[in-house]
Structure formats: C-alpha cells, structure tokens
Amino acid sequence: MVIGHFPRVERIAEHAQLTVLERNCRDEWDTPDPACEYVIPEADYVFMTGVTLINKTATRLLRLAQEAQAHTVMVGPSAVMAPALFARGVEAIAGSIVADPEATRFAVKSGAGKLFGSALQMCVLEAPDAHTTRKRTAGEA
C-alpha cells in the first residue's frame, strides 16, 4: 500500500501487490483516496508521503494503519524527521536533511528540481522498536 503517487511507484508492482491511494488518480494502480477505509485494513505495509501531514490526512491514515497492524513508513522529501511520529505507529521515516545550507538555499531560490547530492542527504530514522515483528493470524483484519 502506497499513499501518494511517488515517481516510479510502478516498480513496486514488480515485487508486490500494489495499491496506490491518490487524490489525483492518473494510472491503473491509483485508487481514489476516499477508499482508504477499505484498502488500508488489508495492507501489510503502508508507505505514505509526508504530504499527508501537510494535507491533514496523516492522523486518520496512521490510525487505520495501526488498526491493521501494518508496518508503516513515512517517506519522501516532505517527510518530517520527527520521532513523535513513532508514537503514532510509524516505524521508520525515510526523508532528507540539509547537508549544505548554502547549496540548498541556492537550489531553492533558483528553482532547481534536484537537491540530493551535496545540498540534501537522504536518511532513515527508525523507531527504537521498529524491528518488532507484527504478525496477523488468520481471520484478523
């Protein structure tokens, strides 16, 4: 389960059953986001963009993922590296941090689309108990 249509998300479909919850559907994997209450309970893994924090859907989506006992990861440049998300069921945050403030400032001012490399560095912050295995038994939602 992916919440938010990431670039190259279709590559996940090569390895797993893919459902993408998306506000602006644009291809065969996309499902309108109001369907979240029907599809998240069936998910083993939920990857959601940090945009869910911005558009105020994160609280509801994280609650559904917790109820489903799904492994949940907040991803993307908009993912806030905030350990407080761990209390909401997020197991890892895969985002970015500013590595070079001047290069970042220049890239933002000039409208550069690619900031990774010298300006931003990708990183992963894991919850202290992130490797705890969650198992569902037959019949559990």
Identify what each model region corresponds to.
Residues 11, 57-64, 84:
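A short acidic, amphipathic alpha-helical/loop segment
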Residues 40-41:
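A short, aliphatic-rich alpha-helical micro-motif
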Residues 1-20:
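Internal active-site segments that recognize and position negatively charged phosphoryl groups
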Residues 1, 45-49, 73:
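Structural motif
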Residues 71-141:
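C-terminal functional extensions of proteins
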Residues 23-37:
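Adenosine-cofactor binding site in Rossmann-like domains, unifying the SAM/SAH pocket
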Residues 17-20, 64-74:
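Short beta-strand/loop segments at the ligand-binding rim of alpha/beta enzyme cores
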Residues 54-56, 102:
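Short glycine-rich, flexible loops that bind phosphorylated cofactors or substrates
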